[in-house]
């Protein structure tokens, strides 16, 4: 479904990142239905900030989908538990067998928001009838999961962890065409999407093929920056369509269960 034409900018609905200090600097943040690249090297908290969006949306009554292609659901959730997320406030549905997806969606408490975590790594171990040399099979599996969960549970937000793993799994023969079709599929689903992208340490590019940079509606970059013999996590919004945004670099901190973007455009106070 293509985005409708709005008569006034206040008609544009937005999804927060729930990062204090960042949302206020990007016009309330991401327009609904947009696709955002979350780019960063290892250890920059890409998975954490995307899960943070899903969690707070679920606390507010919305549903979200997290598809992990490599990291196990247990590893992800143990990490989030250590960050003090309270899962009693939401429905947390872990799917390791796609045959159980419909049944698990039917028994959730409708008075709460939900996070559906599909552990594709586990599914890959169990499924034997998908040809691993067919670059379309796993991509179609992932699309079908997104479509099913989105339609049947009215999912508002989707996270793919990660694009890099998808490229290994699906081996794109013509990245420009195939990536265009993936991005258009997500837009047709009218779901706000966060696509995690592995970035080299030198920050020389935001994505594997660099085509993603142009197809995405927004790019949020996370970095680890040495500063006075300490390492500072940093966050910046490189681009965001339909949004007046501050492109300054902020320090990214997590404390007392909340993310904070601090010292935008300034040296961090260390």
Where is each model-derived feature located?
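Extreme N-terminal, non-catalytic leader segments
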Residues: 1-33, 39
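C-terminal regions of RecA-like/P-loop NTPase motor modules
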Residues: 2-9, 240-270
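Walker A/P-loop NTP-binding active-site region of P-loop NTPases
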Residues: 25-97
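Hydrophobic/aromatic beta-strand patches that form the interior of the parallel beta-sheet core
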Residues: 36, 65-67, 116-118, 194, ...
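Short, ordered loop/turn segments at secondary-structure junctions
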Residues: 41-43, 69-72, 92-97, 122, ...
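Conserved inter-motif catalytic segment of the P-loop NTP-binding fold
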Residues: 67-156
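P-loop NTPase motor core
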Residues: 130-214
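Phosphate-binding/switch region of NTP-binding enzymes
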Residues: 191-257
